[in-house]
Amino acid sequence: MLMPKRTKFRKQQKGQFAGLSKGATFVDFGEFGMQTLERGWVTSRQIEACRVAINRYLKRKGKVWIRVFPDKSVTKKPAETRMGKGKGAPDHWVAVVRPGRILFEVANVSREDAQDALRRAAAKLGIRTRFVKRVERV
């Protein structure tokens, strides 16, 4: 699982989802990528499941880049606990994604293989995504 080595504070507030992605909106490293169409949280388990799905489909061909990192802690209170008594303990880590964010990039494979691999990975996520290819920027 991906998680930060250390953070300044153990617990975080929920934050806002408004707006579009501020960065990582273009395919910069590979030839093809997976871009988000919705906003939401992507957990470290979902990122790992996507990585495994892509690598299993490509069978050591090509190269994969993960463009998101789960740096936000999500807390959870124990089961059957009454309300109040403070915020729960950190439970898992998520990456906040907004529309336009590139999640994964793939290189050195055919378009069909990249599309199939990223489609399998997209099935592991709880948000809508689309397949994009690299465009030359000036």
UniProtKB/Swiss-Prot annotation:
UniProt xrefs under HAMAP family: Ribosomal_uL16
Encoding gene, per UniProt annotation: rplP
Domain of life from the UniProt record: Bacteria
Quaternary context: Part of the 50S ribosomal subunit.
GO terms, molecular function: rRNA binding; structural constituent of ribosome; tRNA binding
Protein name: Large ribosomal subunit protein uL16
Family named by the database record: Belongs to the universal ribosomal protein uL16 family.
Keyword list, A-Z: Ribonucleoprotein, Ribosomal protein, RNA-binding, rRNA-binding, tRNA-binding
Origin organism lineage: Bacteria, Pseudomonadati, Chlamydiota, Chlamydiia, Chlamydiales
Provenance organism: Chlamydia caviae (strain ATCC VR-813 / DSM 19441 / 03DC25 / GPIC) (Chlamydophila caviae)
Gene Ontology biological-process entries: translation
